[in-house]
Structures are given as structure tokens and as C-alpha cells.
Amino acid sequence: MLNDILSRVARVGAMHAGNRPNPPADRPQPCQGKPPTSPGKTIKHKSFLGALAGAVAGALVAAAVAAAAVFLVGVTGGLAVAAVGALAVFAAGDLISAVTNKVSAVVDSASPAFGPVASGSGNVFVEKQPVARATKDTVACTKHNSPQLIAQGSESVFVNDAPAARIDDKTVCGATLKEGASTVFFGSGQGTYLEIADEFSWWEKALLIAVEFLVPPSRGMLKGLGKLFTRNGLKSVLKGAKAGALFITKVPGKMGCAARAFKANKGMARFKEAAKAFKKDPVYLASGEVIESRTDIELGQTLPLVFERTYRSASAHTGLLGRGWHDSWSEVATVTHDGLNTHVVITLAQGYDIDFTFHQDVQAVYCPHYPEFTLHRRGDGFSLWHRDQQTWRDFSVVQGERRLLSAIHDSHDNRIELVRDPKGYLRQLRHSDGVTLLLVWQGEYLHQIQRIDGGQKTLLAEYRQDEQGRLVEANATHAYHLYYEYNTAHRLTRWHDNDQTWARYEYDAQGRCVYTTCADGFLTARFDYLPDRVVMTDGLGQRSEFGFNDLHLMSWEQSPLGHITRYEYDEVGNLLREISPAGRVVEFTYLDDTGRVSTFTDGSGHQWQYDYDDAQRLCGVTDPLGREWGWVYDAEGNPERLTGPDASEVRFTWNRYGLLTQVSDAAGEVQARLQYDHRQRLLSATDAESRTRQLRYDRQDRVVQWQRADGARFRLGYRRASWTLPEQLIRPDDKEEQRQYDRHNNLLSYVDGNGALWRQTFGPFDLLTARTDAEGRTWRYEYDRESQQLIAVTAPDGSRWQWWLDADGRVIRERDMTGTETHYGYDEDGLCIRVRNGEGDTRHFLYDARGLLLRETAPDDTLHYRYDAAGRLTEVSSATAHVQLDYDLRDRVVREWHNGTLLTRQYDDAARTVTRTLTWDGDADDTTGTLAPLTSLFHYTRTGELRQVQLPDGADLTLTHDAAGRESLRTGGSGFVQQREYDVMGWLTREQSGAQHDGRLQPAQTREYRYDGAGNLTGVRHNRDAEGYRLDATGRVQEMLSGGAGKPVDTTARFHYTRTGLPQEAGRLTEWQAGRLVQHDDTHYQYDRAGRLIRKQVVQPGYRPQVWQYRWDSRNQLRVVDTPNGERWLYRYDPFGRRVGKRCDQKAEETRYLWDGDQIAEIRHYRHGQLIQRRHWVYNGWELVVQQRQHTGGDWETDFVTSSQNGTPQALFTPDGTLRWQVPKATLWGQRQTEKSESPDPGLAFAGQLRDSESGLCYNRFRYYDPAGGCYVSPDPIGIAGGESNYGYVQNPNTRVDPLGLAGCAMGEILADADKWSLAKIGDRQKGMIKDKLSTVKERSKALNTKMREHFNANEQKIISEWEKQTGMNWPTLSSGSRATPHHVIPIKNGGSNEWWNIIPVQHPHTGTIHGTGSALRTHLPYQKDGGKLWNLLGY
């Protein structure tokens, strides 16, 4: 139901809860993330920016390349679980990805605003503005006139357990977040956490690049509502309206359509703009109509076979379903004659009419108001061409003046035949893919739709009408079951689902809706239709006003706080200019003869240009920097080649049905191959390393088996006929997982491989109201009645996290579970300009005309930001730091200067290598020659796994992978070897490391792993010692056991947990207050009003108390540590929040760090100002694989590192395989039993953690972790998106990590699940990169999530292309011929990045086990810990 509601634009809003801005804390590496967005920041619609889609070339390209696959999700049904993998979206290659990202990101950020981000984190701020989060926060979308949840966000940064929403992320309604912070960047990579309404048809998505200013009515976005509801009146209009005829005279050689002059309350020229006028459930303000739109059936592998129905309260039309209802199969052409002129009115499924006038001998007519449509004469009938969907509709069945729809087909001759009886009644639909539907009638109306091909007789939908011919019951058997009620005027007065969701409407004498309300008081509003405006008063008495022009397009809108946004159009309704409340302006120009966008100008005057071929297809895009992207199409209109600014190419091969079969580069190297069965369903996908995934289907085209490249098979079971979501999964190890859904596709329960049960409860509009874990702990969620934004979360112990909204729905105050409060302020455009923490420290933010952050002013420092014309960050400066960034043509950072250090990267795409060089100022003066720049060469496989690293001293490390793409062998130096073995589930079971002699490994270290049915680690054998774990139902450690060969089994530790999940070890005193550790044995903790640790005191009888003092800056960065022995340590950070140095004057010691992204690449130790030692680190993902040490004047010592599953280094081996160092024993939470010495010890703890001996803490990128207490010492920068506890570490440190100090996740389990469902093998390199970013996994604000989602949508193709380039594989294609869906491993909502390494191809992103309840990811990173509909959208 949620999906449906979302599509209706009306209630999408904040349904997914969680609308708190995220405090900016530290930022991800420059340019590897995106500026987070905040309440007030503008959003943009691709639909509105149809032409802008071209600007979003990147994402478009990817879509284009994957044309056939994009539609898969809707076509094949929710078989996602099994296919959720490699077949998702066939990327066009690195080129496309580069193009896509660039153009799309640029365009998204520059596109016109269609409302502001409405809410953000209540306790996380960036540049003093609440950080918006995906799945939690909403936007005030003017296109939909209702709160829309942010669907995308960072894949690596989470705020309050939600992915931080950033520029270019999208909302559920398809809008793109366009403005964000100017100095802060959150996690690279973009994750999609909520279903995004399709703003473009499958073809448009395939060629989003087409820069079309429209959003065809495919599955999604109002199911076509906001898209073609530009004409909201009755069909009665003036024939041959002169307006259209006059316009046509401007187009030589073409006879235009006579645009009908609609009556006063009707007629919007462009559906994109019309969508802005939808409010509440939804009500179309321009006319006062109530619109109810649903898609009951979606089938077909090539050409979509869709049954969409739309009710319009002012319509007199009678379709298959009854009075007032339009539908996909009742589309009709009505013909009249006027002298030599023939007038044809096409009535489409969404209930709008398009009027064409044929003059004598004219065979084709173009409509300027709907330039995507062209009508052709065909004998006595007509054919309607939709250029964006690349489909024809034939109207050839003659019934008087009417021509009934007889067929739908495309340029590949994929066809849907509508078979009618002599009276014109539709009896069957026959699809060339092999699908046959039978229509059963009851009297004059449609009663049932059955699928009868293959000997089946499956009921897909059933309808019932009353005696007056009004639809009163509609049962789409795979989803919702709805009931309708009408008044005496036959207007819809109420609909309900016979459960908890309903909506009610009241009308005035003119038939306009004047009042609406929904279940539990949601979406309540009263409408007043004044001569010059429409006034909407919501349930809280807050007043919004809207003005419309002569075309009934919204010309201005005023928010409850009085902020006015204005829109200007041309004579046919194309948006020319949008002016924000603060005066920010974006502009568009169009081609007269096609309506295509020709230029887009952002708020700073930078312009993008678009070129089209004779077929009106986008063939070129030029950005403000002069970079050009070009597309070439084959004779059938399929994108055949994409060329980027650097002259690189990606080539595509298609079969006769228009399905992608191969992706290759300019040299002819194949990246991917796809094969289909006789029904055009994807059978297999083979990557560049010849690894093949296979799929099998049932008669309803549902995936019933998915086989990985290594032969492991996963079987899917469906308990209900026509149900598209699998409710049973039989794994390769024969373990069974179960899921139960309600009729709205909401996941009610999940049973994992251990039999543990998780439950969820939903309220009206499918809002998550309660979640109960396998241990019986329940979290409850509350929402704002108007915006449906999350406003409160109640933990199992009764503690609450709350947010307060202003009249515009923006979070202005937040109080976390510890009572810490944060306040936010905004400008007219909704940009956060002020954030005040609990200590009263205020940070101010200033933005440019594009909404990019220019300056961040705080009591202790001021940061300045600069960007290039494309909106890329080029420079950041503060009182103590200066950072400069250079990019290549693919937007990759190739040079980064920072206060005397330089990091350069050289990319050789043909050789698949990256050369990294680290340089320090002053080294050139070194006379010993020992301080030469450090250059490392990284080699990758064709599928993106790290294959080899060549080190500065000449040593190398080589990684080998098995048939499934998992690392199986690691060799280095003259004799080091590590071997790995996996079980049928792909879980690591054995790892041996040591020296190789005479071709045989002589292990010095052997580690064996055991797991339970849910994939939780239950035992580790290290050589002759063993350690076991007894876990509770949720996977937390309850007991630690030790033993081994000849040793008795002893219990070494027992744990129990608070109601909120915080650990307490048996026999030790641990006191938590409101989620913060206040005492652990003899150690006492004290915090300031901003929730940061300021004093730690150890009191032992007979000893003087030992006291540590901590001081923080306004950005929550630890600056000073005073130790008990009188030492004072000072910490320095760069503008991105990375610690770049620490020093102690008392000891005359200093340490400096040079970063590569979010990882330290080199460390230099100084004493008395002299360099005494340096270390060089090389990572594979979040795992340290090489450490090199050099003492002053000495040679480099190279060690190869082995690590445990949680990233903790276990041992160092010399190049000849000799064991040099082993990690000391530590507690479950990382507290070592011995202190680090001057040994080769890297000084690392869990993944992403650097131990600081002076403070006893671990630096964790964005926070500091206390291993003694097993918790953080400051609030989570991303707030509730970071988890149920603002201070807690991961649930189980054996299997989960938090590399960035933002959110913990079970990396091993998550990656295993991802690999299991990916349609393409996930290489070690990709896994490593994912692991490396897991630390950033934090729930983003709705705004940030939306930004990230928008960014992903805009750059999808580019990202896919980059994935293809980095992995060496072709993006898989589904059985439908569509490309696999790109699925984020770490969801945007949880902080996932929109980067190639964070996406995998899957069959359906919203029904995959990887993100399903009970999955490793969802177990450790619940999509909506604070509520929302993400679970539903994911099908779990």
C-alpha cells in the first residue's frame, strides 16, 4: 500500500519517518562524498526538468545503456530476493559512469527547485543546519504538494540511523535534492532506501539522457498522475483551438495539433508542472478534483503490460471499471470532422485528453503541449507515437466516432494485442513475450483479469460495481484490496482498505474538493478556491497559498511561513524559470519543434547544453566546463555507443527484441554477456571474468532459483498465487528463511536461519509503528499528522528521541534520548543557516546562488569553500588548513594538496591500474635519499577485485580469487602465503598464513571459523586455542568460552544487556544513564551539555584518583586531552574532519597523518622536531594488508598483515613468511590486556580505529571509541540514523564493524548476503572498499537521503559504467531483457555511497535478502530504526 500511496504523490510525504538533520561532525574525504542537505534546501524534479534529464546525462546514460532492464522490477515482480545481485543494471562502462555522475550530479544540483527539504535531523547538524536523512525526512515537493520522503542517501554516512541525504539524492516522488552544505561532504556513494517513483518510462530511463521534460506514466510517481494530469477538466473543449494551430505555424513542414482551450478550471499545458498542484490524498488544486490512481498489474519482459486505473471526480468517462474511471485498456480516439479538417481527441489511461487536428492530406500531427506525442493516420484508424516510451498505440477498431485501442507495440516488434469481440468488448490481451490475459465481464463492466498462458488460470485482479455502475471494490491480488464509496453526484467520498487506512473527501456545489482527511487525522486539509488563488489550511491550522496562470500551471506558492516560490512558463507550459523565496533562479530554454530542453542555467549562471538527433534523441551534452558527452544509436533506436569527454567509449549490443546482450569497450573487450529464454526472461549473466549467474522462473515469471557462479543455489518459494514477493528462501546449506507480508506488501515477520522471529506493526498509510526484535524488545514510532515525518521514537526502556517542526515542516529542535538538545534555523529557501548545540555554541552557514555552502562560521574557526562551474569542490580553507583538489575528466580526484602534503592518483583504465604517490614538502631537501615520495601501484581484475599491489620498496602482494570471486590466495615477497577456504554459503571457514617451502604452505597461523544458521560467528580456532560464543536470538554475545586441544572449556565472560541493547558484563559494575556510560567498575564518566565526555576519573582505594580531561570544538572534534601524569595532547583536523596531527609539548613528540580518503596512508613520528620514524599503510577496503616501517636513515621494513573478520590486525609476516608479530589478547570490546610497545604493532583496533595510548581511546574517524566501556564518548554525528543508541558500538564486535564511528554493521555477514544475491560476483577489491566504508554507515536524514537518492538516479548510468570498468564485468541483464537493478550494498539511508563499489546488480532492489528483515544488513543496520516504510518498500 505504501508504494501505491507513494505513487499517488499525495501521501508519500514523511511516511518513512525520521526527519532530523544530521550534525556535520567530520566529513568524508573531499569530493568522495556529497554535500549534505538540510531543511530549506531546494529539490528538483527530473519530470519537471525533463530536459534536465539530459543534464543528468550520467544517470541517464546508465539508464539508457540498461534500457531493457530498467523496467524489470515492475515486470518480473518481486523476485528480487534471488536475483538481487548482479543482473540489476547493466552499466555502460566507466565512461558512462563518469559521464553519468558528472552530468547528472551537476544537473541535479543545478536543476530548478520544486520546493524545499522540509525536515532534518533533530540533533545532527552540518553548517548549523539539520542534516536531512533518507527514509526519515521529507521534502515539501511543489510538484506533488505533499510531503515526500527522501529515498536516497549516502551509503557511508548515516544520521540517526538513516542515510544522510545529500545533493543528488532523490525523494520517493522522484525529486532530486539540489542544494546542500558548501563545506561538508557526506559519504561517497549513493544508496536507495525507499522506492522511488518512476519519473520516466522504461525507455526514458534507458535514455534519461534524452533530457526530456516529462515523466511518462510508468510504475511509480502517481502512476502517471502528476505526469499527464495537466488537463484536469472534462473532455468538452473547443475543437480546433487556434492556440495550437498558431503555434504550429512556427514549425515548418509539420502540421501541429490544435491544443484545446480548456474551461476555466481545466487544462494544464504540461503534466510535469501540473503535478505541483497535487495536495494531500491527492487533491488537484487547479481544479479541485480528487484523483485516485492505482496500477493493478505489471507484467511483460520487453514491452510493459500494465493495467493502470485512474479515477477523476470531475470526469464523465466510463471505462472498463465503471463511472469516472479511466484505465490503460480503455484508451480511445474520438474522431470528428469539420470541413476538410479532422479532429482527433486521444483519451489516455490517466484521464487526460490530447487534441490533434489533421488538415487535408496531413498524415502526422505533432502537439506542442504534449511534444512527446505524435499522431499518425493509419487508414480508418490512428497510431499514437510516444517518443519517450518509444511505443506505438494503435486505435483501429471502429465504433462510430470512436477508435478503440487495438495494439501496443515498439520498434522491436514486441507487441500487445487487444482482442475484442464483435461488440468491442475486450476479451483477451496477448503479449509477444508469451503472456495471455483473459478478461471476465459481469454485465457491462470488467469483473476479473486472469492469466491463462502456460496452462495456468491465475486470478490477478477482481472488481465489483454497484447498481449505478460505480466501482466499489478492487482487489489486486498481489497487493492491495480497496473499497470505494460515492455521493449522489457519483463523486468519490471515501476509500479504505478494510484495515487501518482510509481517506475521506467533501465537495462544494461546483464539485470541487473542499475538505479531506485520512486515518488517524493524517493529511487533513481544507481548501478555499478564491478568484486569484487557492488556500489550503491543514489540520494544524497552518495556511498555504497557491496561484495559477491561464494554463492552470502553478505560478507561485506560499508556504505557511510566508516563503514564496515563483514559476514562469512559455506559451505551451514549458518551465522557463523558477525563482526561490531567497531569489535563487534557474532557467531553461527549449527547442521550438520538439519541446526538448536545449539549455539549463543554474543559479550561478553556469549553463548546460543539450543536442538531439533527427529522431529527437539526446546525442550530446556539454557542461559548463566545456566537456562533451555523445551518444550514437543503431537503426532500431537503441543506444549503441557512448563517448565521454576523454574520448573513451562504451558499446552496447542488443537482440531483436531490444534487450541488451553485451557491453564492451572501444577495444572490443567484453564486459558482460546476457542470455534470455524464449519468453525474453534473463537466464544468465556472464561477467568479464567469465563468471556466470543463472536464473530459473515459474509460470508466472517469478524467479524460483538463482545460481551463483560457484554453483551455489538459492531457491525461492511463493505461498500465494500471483504474489510477487517470495516468502520462503531455501539456502545452499538447506537452511530456510521465512517472511510474512500483509496485503500492502508490508513485512510483518521474518524468521532467520536459526528460527528467530522478528515482528513489525504498521499503522495507517503503512507507517511503521512498532518493531520487535527476536529478544522481544520493542521500539515504537510516532509521526506528524501533516507531514508524516517521524517526530518521536520510544525505546524499549521508555526513553524517547523527539523532534519539533516549524510550520513549514522543518526540524527546529531535537532532543535525543539523553536529553541533549539541538536547535536549528533556516533561511527562506529552507537552507539551514544556524545550528546551536547543548552548550550554546552556534555555527552559521552561508550559501551561494546554487545553494552550495560558501562559509561556515563557528566560535573557534571559519571555513571557506570554493567550487568550479560544475559544482565540484576545489578548495577549502580555515585558520589552520588549506586544501585544494584537482579532477580528471571523469571527476576523479587526481591531486589533493593539504598543508604541505600532496597525494596524487594516476588512472590507467586500459591496464586497470591506479598509481598513488604520497609527497611531503621538505622531502626534496633530504640528502640521504630516504625521504623520496612513496609510490604504490594497484592492479585490479576486470571485475574490480584488487589483484596486486606493487610497493615503494619493490615488494609486491598478489591476491588470487576463486570461481565465485572471493579471495582464495594471497602471496607476497619471497615466501609469504595466505590461503582461504569458504563454505557453500560463501562464509570464510579457514585461513592459513605462513611461509611457502618447496611449494607447500607451512602455516604459522591457522584460524578456523564456525557459524550458526543465521551466519553469526560462533567459534574461532586459532592454532591450538579455541574460543566459542553463545549468542542470544539477535546475535549478541552472551557467553565467551575458551578451550582448545587438551584444554578444558571455560567460561571467560558473560554478558547481559539493557533494554536498549547496551552491554553489561556479569560480575562487573556497569552503569548506563539514558544510553551513556557513567560508570564502569572504578571509572566514572562526566559529560557536558552537548553530550561529550569531558572528564574520566579512575578511583581506586588507597590511590590518588587518576583524571583525564577532554575539550571539544564546536564541530564536536576532540581537541585537547589532559592526562593524569600532566601531559597535554593537542589534536588537529583538516576541513573534512580527518585528524591530521597530534602533539605533546611535554614529551616533545608529534605525529602527523596523510590520508587517502577515509584511510591513513602514511604516518610520521617526530621527536624534538626531528623525524624519527614513518609508516606506510596499504588497505584493501577497510582491511590493512601491508605495513611498511622506516626509521630515520634506515631501510624500509615490509610486513604483510592478516586480519580477523572485524578488521582487527591479527599478525604481521615478513616477506619470507616469518611471523613477526601477533596481536595481544583483548576483551570482546577491544580492550587489550597489555599496552602497545615500540614493536611493529600497527596500533589499530577494530576496523577504522587507531589506538591513542595517551587517552585510552581509539580514534574512529568521526568519533572516539572507549574500548574499556565498549562505547563512544560523544553523540553519534548522524543522530538516530546511527542506531538505537547514540553512544553504543556495534551489536556484536566479532561480526560487525563501525569504521567511521557512525554506525556498526556486520561486514562479514553483509558481504556474504550481498554476494549471495548479487547477479555478479563481488570481488575482493569491492568487498574491501565496502568494508572500508562500513564505518560511515549511518542513517541519513530524509533530506540527505533524498539528495543521495537523487544523485544516484541522476548518476546511475555513470556509476554502473564505473562499476563495469572497475570490475571488468558487464552489468547483468534480467530475463525480461532489462538490465539488472543497481542495488546499494550499504543503503543510502544507512549512509551508503553512490559509488561503483557500493552497488551490485540485482533483480529487484526492494525485495532482496541483502536488505531484507533478518538479513545481515537489516539485522545490523535496520533500515528504519526510527520508523518508516522502508521495510515495506524493500519487500521485507
Curated annotation (Swiss-Prot):
Knockout mutant characteristics: A double rhsB-rhsIB deletion is outcompeted by wild-type cells, restoration of rhsIB restores normal growth in competition experiments. Restoration of growth requires the RhsB-specific immunity protein, rhsIA does not restore growth.
EC number, UniProt record: 3.1.-.-
Molecular function via GO: nuclease activity; toxin activity
Residue numbers spanned by region Disordered: 16-42
Gene3D superfamilies in the cross-refs: 2.60.200.60, RHS repeat-associated core (2.180.10.10)
Enzyme type, top EC level: hydrolase
Key words of the record: Hydrolase, Membrane, Nuclease, Repeat, Toxin, Transmembrane, Transmembrane helix, Virulence
Membrane topology: Multi-pass membrane protein
Primary site of residence: membrane
Domain of life of the source: Bacteria
Subcellular location: Membrane
One GO CC annotation: membrane
InterPro entries noted in UniProt: DUF6531 (IPR045351), HNH_nuc (IPR003615), PAAR_motif (IPR008727), Rhs_assc_core (IPR022385), RHS_repeat (IPR031325), T6SS_VgrG/RHS (IPR050708), YD (IPR006530)
Listed transmembrane segments: 48-68, 70-90
Annotated coiled-coil segments of the chain: none
YD repeat residue intervals: 486-521, 569-605, 612-647, 766-799, 847-879
Role noted for this protein: Toxic component of a toxin-immunity protein module, which functions as a cellular contact-dependent growth inhibition (CDI) system. This protein may be a nuclease that is specifically inhibited by its cognate immunity protein RhsBI. Upon expression of the C-terminus (residues 1284-1436) in E.coli growth is inhibited, cells elongate, nucleoids condense and plasmid DNA is degraded; these effects are blocked specifically by cognate immunity protein RshIB. Cell contact is necessary for growth inhibition.
Membership in a protein family: Belongs to the RHS/WapA nuclease family.
Record protein name field: Probable deoxyribonuclease RhsB
